[in-house]
């Protein structure tokens, strides 16, 4: 007889515990009900990126001295620098510079360690394409400045997101 009573008590304790867990989940759900939505309508609304956002790399061909510091500090040896030694002036002449953004991890080491500041990070983050080979940018594509989303009248920019209270 006693085993049946203890089983009934265990069943009651499990029921109370399950009801408590469901109630806690319901309270958490209700606390989130009065918050503003965090999502945005992406193609028509875009967030203004922060000042230190690491987007596509911008390259200035005239400033580059082909020192290859960017290649040495890159964790995956990504930038491809082709240069030719000019014997009459004893300097390197840059021929080609390219970065494959399909492989790039956007760590920013190349920008940080560049001695001539010919590399900089932009706020451009829309790099998606249908073919991987289109992500390999040469010096001409890297030299393009991104279009600012603030100047585009078809896109509504969202400056401040609602603060999330934890």
Swiss-Prot record:
Which reactions is this enzyme annotated as catalysing? a plastoquinone + NADH + (n+1) H(+)(in) = a plastoquinol + NAD(+) + n H(+)(out); a plastoquinone + NADPH + (n+1) H(+)(in) = a plastoquinol + NADP(+) + n H(+)(out)
Q: Name one GO biological process term.
A: photosynthesis, light reaction
Q: What is its main location?
A: plastid
Any one GO MF term held by the record is: 4 iron, 4 sulfur cluster binding
Which SUPFAM superfamilies does UniProt cross-reference here?
4Fe-4S ferredoxins (SSF54862)
Q: Which domain of life is it from?
A: Eukaryota
State where [4Fe-4S] cluster 2 binds. 74, 104, 107, 110
What's an example GO cellular component term for this entry?
chloroplast thylakoid membrane
What membrane topology was assigned to this protein in its record? Answer: Peripheral membrane protein
CC cofactor: [4Fe-4S] cluster
Question: Where in the numbering of this chain does the 4Fe-4S ferredoxin-type domain appear?
Answer: 55-84, 95-124
- What EC number(s) are associated with this protein in UniProt? 7.1.1.-
Q: In which compartments does the protein localize?
A: Plastid, Chloroplast thylakoid membrane
The residues that cross the membrane are: none
Give the record's keywords alphabetically.
Answer: 4Fe-4S, Chloroplast, Iron, Iron-sulfur, Membrane, Metal-binding, NAD, NADP, Plastid, Plastoquinone, Quinone, Repeat, Thylakoid, Translocase
- Textual note on the cofactor: Binds 2 [4Fe-4S] clusters per subunit.
Q: What class of enzyme is it?
A: translocase
Q: Per its database record, what is this protein's job?
A: NDH shuttles electrons from NAD(P)H:plastoquinone, via FMN and iron-sulfur (Fe-S) centers, to quinones in the photosynthetic chain and possibly in a chloroplast respiratory chain. The immediate electron acceptor for the enzyme in this species is believed to be plastoquinone. Couples the redox reaction to proton translocation, and thus conserves the redox energy in a proton gradient.
Q: Which family does it belong to?
A: Belongs to the complex I 23 kDa subunit family.
State the oligomer form and interacting partners: NDH is composed of at least 16 different subunits, 5 of which are encoded in the nucleus.
State the protein's name: NAD(P)H-quinone oxidoreductase subunit I, chloroplastic
Taxonomic placement: Eukaryota, Viridiplantae, Streptophyta, Embryophyta, Tracheophyta
List the gene name. Answer: ndhI
